[in-house]
Amino acid sequence: MSAKIDITGDWTVAVYCAASPTHAELLELAAEVGAAIAGRGWTLVWGGGHVSAMGAVASAARACGGWTVGVIPKMLVYRELADHDADELIVTDTMWERKQIMEDRSDAFIVLPGGVGTLDELFDAWTDGYLGTHDKPIVMVDPWGHFDGLRAWLNGLLDTGYVSPTAMERLVVVDNVKDALRACAPS
């Protein structure tokens, strides 16, 4: 295990990811992201669970000496197995509070393959950025085409005027961790 990185790291990245599937490639991707965030001396903020991709991203960050901040609503403490190894574990009353704290504590967002909860977090952060609440990078890592259907639908909304080009430009889509971290890095 590496020495702990100073908790006052210059940069904090929220990772939105799955809490259910255990596909090897998903867990490997999440672990790669967690290790890469820690390797840069950045802080990881994530959903606070110790299952699926959430557990993999946080465990890998800590294994590489990174500082981890988990944010979990009390209704999910047992369902998502709250990660009591987190350097800081924040238990909220609601999902909304979880998302707000994660957004407030982060300088950038990485979205990994996930389901409805991941999409909820993505759309919240993306909408807030589009509306000018923040100017933080929002980066979707999609190495296997998990989000192809979503992206096709969004492009259809763009083509018909329901989504603006400016909004689409706020969402960066990459297929590897190196490019994701580059897109998240401070300018």
Curated annotation (Swiss-Prot):
Instruction: Summarize the PTM comment.
Output: Pupylated at Lys-74 by the prokaryotic ubiquitin-like protein Pup, which leads to its degradation by the proteasome. The proteasomal control of cytokinin synthesis is essential to protect M.tuberculosis against host-produced NO.
Residue positions annotated to bind substrate are E80, R98, K99, G115, V116, G117, T118, L119, D120, E121, T127
Documented EC number(s): 3.2.2.n1
An annotated Gene Ontology molecular function: hydrolase activity, hydrolyzing N-glycosyl compounds
List the catalysed reactions.
N(6)-(dimethylallyl)adenosine 5'-phosphate + H2O = N(6)-dimethylallyladenine + D-ribose 5-phosphate; 9-ribosyl-trans-zeatin 5'-phosphate + H2O = trans-zeatin + D-ribose 5-phosphate
Which enzyme class, named as a word?
hydrolase
What is this protein identified as? Cytokinin riboside 5'-monophosphate phosphoribohydrolase
Q: Which organism is it from?
A: Mycobacterium tuberculosis (strain ATCC 25618 / H37Rv)
Q: Which gene encodes it?
A: log
